[in-house]
């Protein structure tokens, strides 16, 4: 193999881009770019029953959205194509026929029912299920007889017995498997389709992959692929198996786990930023030197070291993701935040589909008020709820504030000051609050908290005078009088 690093991300077009797969793509991409190598995308579509229409394009679109680009694939071509496994059947045929000729693979005529019975008998004896090798040494006559009965053969790889397969995993160190624990495995199904392990081994060799970085759920596939490499006399790439992503309860991420949003498409729909997701996902199972946590793509490429992939499972912390995204939202200019949030307010029916001059200016001020605390685009609907409803529900903490003895006086004087205002602006409202302080002698929390709670229903929030301006004079006075009465 040459010195140039060549790595791949090989999705199946079975659905949308999952965060675990996005992470695999990101680590391979960063490794290739950090080494001045090539990043390839290969589509593994041999399991036709699971493929969905548009699945392939969806994967590519969301990789692009994340900021990942590639050197070779179905869309950009390359010298080692085709890059879709379903278009490589003639290539696979060459190599499984070679294995058959060398006696390193054989035709298996067992039916699914026979194999199931075999597995049940092994389980009853407390043995690990593996193929017995029943068809391993059939004579040509026996094979012809079975074919005359109408049996379609699959092709099995002849696993060498009594050997140990060892490889030095980039992430986990040395891993070994005894071949006696691995039964002869199918490399070509009865319908002539190559199985995953065979197609992957052939493709990785012919596409000149130097490293195979993937999830640790593939570890048990690795000895099978190494045996295929050995049987065909090929150099073996370096393997690295990344730890799984777990939820905050340290349980393996399951697609049924609804506590975590798991598809990149959903994050785009919620108004997360691709740069923030790129940053967050890269730190799931990889750590830089030092304490810094926010990096641009270019910085990641510069500092990425494949030897710093973690040996421990990566915990998906939703609060951390929101924090990371918020850091990126804060850096946007206001027009970008408006672009990120307004569609969510429109979808929720809070503002017009076509914003007019005065409404546009009001929305602009509203979003400016919440930019600092906004975690993701769609959150704007929840954060600004108090501006779009007539009545406020006060929670226990808010009611406790309103029960303090100075509250009636503070709110009465504040309402009087607001009623006298000709210009209902944040500056005038700020001056009114100061006037209340002067007249009542109350200051600090004793002054601000009752005003905030009475007008917004919340004990925390953005700048108070600006919030009151955006609520409007009528709404604010109505809320104040409701409490005073």
UniProtKB/Swiss-Prot annotation:
PROSITE patterns: AA_TRNA_LIGASE_I (PS00178). InterPro entries: aa-tRNA-synth_I_cd-bd (IPR045462), aa-tRNA-synth_I_codon-bd_sub2 (IPR020751), aa-tRNA-synth_I_CS (IPR001412), aa_tRNA-synth_I_cd-bd_sf (IPR008925), Glu-tRNA-ligase_bac/mito (IPR004527), Glu/Gln-tRNA-synth (IPR000924), Glu/Gln-tRNA-synth_Ib_cat-dom (IPR020058), GluQ/Sye (IPR049940). GO terms for molecular function: ATP binding; glutamate-tRNA ligase activity; tRNA binding; zinc ion binding. It catalyses: tRNA(Glu) + L-glutamate + ATP = L-glutamyl-tRNA(Glu) + AMP + diphosphate. Keywords: Aminoacyl-tRNA synthetase, ATP-binding, Cytoplasm, Ligase, Nucleotide-binding, Protein biosynthesis. It is found in: Cytoplasm. One of its GO terms (biological process) is glutamyl-tRNA aminoacylation. ATP binds at residue 255. One of its GO terms (cellular component) is cytosol. SUPFAM superfamilies: An anticodon-binding domain of class I aminoacyl-tRNA synthetases (SSF48163), Nucleotidylyl transferase (SSF52374). Its EC number is 6.1.1.17. A motif ('HIGH' region) lies at residues 11-21. A motif ('KMSKS' region) lies at residues 252-256. It comes from the Bacteria. Its main location: cytoplasm. Monomer. Belongs to the class-I aminoacyl-tRNA synthetase family. Glutamate--tRNA ligase type 1 subfamily. Catalyzes the attachment of glutamate to tRNA(Glu) in a two-step reaction: glutamate is first activated by ATP to form Glu-AMP and then transferred to the acceptor end of tRNA(Glu). HAMAP family: Glu_tRNA_synth_type1. This is Glutamate--tRNA ligase. It comes from Bacillus licheniformis (strain ATCC 14580 / DSM 13 / JCM 2505 / CCUG 7422 / NBRC 12200 / NCIMB 9375 / NCTC 10341 / NRRL NRS-1264 / Gibson 46). The gene is gltX.
């Amino acid at each position: 193999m040459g010195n140039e690093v060549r790595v791949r991300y090989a999705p199946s077009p079975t659905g949308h881009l999952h965060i675990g797969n996005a992470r695999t793509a990101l680590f391979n991409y960063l490794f290739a770019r950090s080494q001045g190598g090539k990043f390839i995308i290969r589509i593994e579509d041999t399991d036709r029953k699971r493929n969905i229409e548009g699945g392939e394009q969806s994967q590519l679109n969301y990789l692009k959205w994340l900021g990942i680009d590639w050197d070779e694939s179905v869309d950009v071509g390359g010298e080692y194509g085709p890059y879709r496994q379903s278009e490589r059947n003639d290539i696979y045929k060459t190599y499984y026929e070679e294995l058959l000729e060398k006696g390193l693979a054989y035709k298996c005529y067992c039916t699914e029912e026979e194999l199931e019975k075999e597995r049940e008998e092994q389980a009853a004896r407390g043995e690990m299920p593996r193929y017995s090798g029943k068809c391993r040494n059939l004579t040509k006559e026996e094979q012809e007889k079975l074919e005359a009965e109408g049996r379609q053969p699959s092709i099995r790889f002849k696993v060498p017995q009594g050997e140990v397969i060892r490889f030095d995993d980039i992430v986990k160190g040395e891993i070994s498997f005894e071949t006696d624990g691995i039964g002869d495995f199918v490399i070509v199904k009865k319908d002539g389709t190559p199985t995953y392990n065979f197609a992957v081994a052939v493709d990785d060799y012919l596409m000149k992959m130097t490293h195979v970085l993937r999830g640790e759920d593939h570890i048990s596939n690795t000895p099978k692929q190494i045996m295929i490499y050995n049987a065909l006399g090929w150099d073996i790439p370096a393997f690295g198996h990344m730890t799984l992503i777990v939820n905050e309860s340290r349980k393996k991420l399951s697609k049924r786990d609804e506590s975590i949003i798991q598809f990149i498409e959903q994050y785009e729909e919620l108004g997360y930023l691709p740069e923030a997701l790129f940053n967050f996902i890269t730190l799931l199972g990889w750590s830089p030197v030092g304490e810094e946590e926010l990096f641009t793509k270019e910085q990641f490429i510069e500092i990425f070291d494949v030897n710093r992939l973690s040996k421990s499972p990566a915990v998906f912390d939703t609060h951390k993701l929101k924090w990371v995204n918020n850091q990126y939202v804060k850096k946007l200019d206001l027009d970008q935040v408006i672009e990120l949030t307004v569609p969510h307010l429109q979808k929720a029916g809070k503002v017009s589909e076509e914003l007019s001059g005065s409404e546009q200016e009001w929305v602009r001020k509203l979003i400016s008020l919440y930019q600092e605390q906004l975690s993701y685009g769609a959150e704007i609907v929840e954060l600004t709820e108090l501006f779009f409803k007539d009545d406020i529900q006060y929670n226990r903490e808010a009611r406790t504030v309103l029960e303090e003895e100075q509250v009636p006086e503070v709110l009465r004087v504040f309402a009087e000051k607001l009623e006298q205002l000709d210009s209902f602006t944040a500056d005038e409202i700020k001056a009114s609050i100061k006037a209340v302080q002067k007249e009542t002698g109350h200051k600090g929390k004793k002054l601000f908290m009752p005003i905030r709670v009475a007008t917004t229903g919340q004990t925390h929030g953005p700048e108070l005078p600006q919030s009151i301006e955006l609520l409007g004079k009528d709404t604010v006075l109505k809320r104040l009088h409701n409490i005073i009465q």
